[in-house]
Amino acid sequence: MPLSLRLSPSPTALSPTTGGFGPSRKQCRIPYSGVPTTKIGFCSLDSRKRGDSSVVRCSLETVNVSVGQVTEVDKDTFWPIVKAAGEKLVVLDMYTQWCGPCKVIAPKYKALSEKYDDVVFLKLDCNPDNRPLAKELGIRVVPTFKILKDNKVVKEVTGAKYDDLVAAIETARSAASG
């Protein structure tokens, strides 16, 4: 299905330095009626003035935010998914393939994702490709669980401590609803 795009420049979109359009990033929500998935689209407009016409580049990316399951993320998909989760609580399991305790808690973590249908559960493999994100989030040991609300870490559990993880999720859910 072709995409038709009509742009009319607003006075605020004009760049005073170039007399044309400056690069801008627009975010738009794309409604999706599927349950239990929410989709959000990001449209980036980068326009430049060329003579009497403007060149516009637009890209659209869809991010799925699922509840009732564990979603694998990486350094490129983590923040868009957290932002798309909106007001939902997000729990991130940071693990490695070789970690014994990570393997032990993985099925319990999956069961938690099925129990809490109002929480988004994510997994991040702390491999060399994802090291920048792991460093940004301050990981020191695996597994580490980070609980986020409104794009901010509100709780952390280090180690495969199932009871501590459940207590942290319950505390964060209570704080979010109260």
Curated annotation (Swiss-Prot):
GO BP terms: cell redox homeostasis; negative regulation of catalytic activity; positive regulation of catalytic activity; regulation of carbohydrate metabolic process; response to light intensity
Organism, scientific name: Arabidopsis thaliana
Domain Thioredoxin: 58-174
Keywords: Chloroplast, Disulfide bond, Electron transport, Glutathionylation, Plastid, Redox-active center, Transit peptide, Transport
Modified-residue entries (S-glutathionyl cysteine), positions: C126
One GO cellular component term noted in the UniProt record for this chain: chloroplast thylakoid
Residues under site feature: Deprotonates C-terminal active site Cys: D93
Record's protein name: Thioredoxin F1, chloroplastic
Lineage of the species this protein comes from: Eukaryota, Viridiplantae, Streptophyta, Embryophyta, Tracheophyta
Keyword Chloroplast: yes
Function: Thiol-disulfide oxidoreductase involved in the redox regulation of enzymes of both reductive pentose phosphate pathway (Calvin-Benson cycle) and oxidative pentose phosphate pathway. Under light or reducing conditions, activates in chloroplast the glyceraldehyde-3-phosphate dehydrogenase, the phosphoribulokinase and the fructose-1,6-bisphosphate phosphatase, and inhibits the glucose-6-phosphate dehydrogenase.
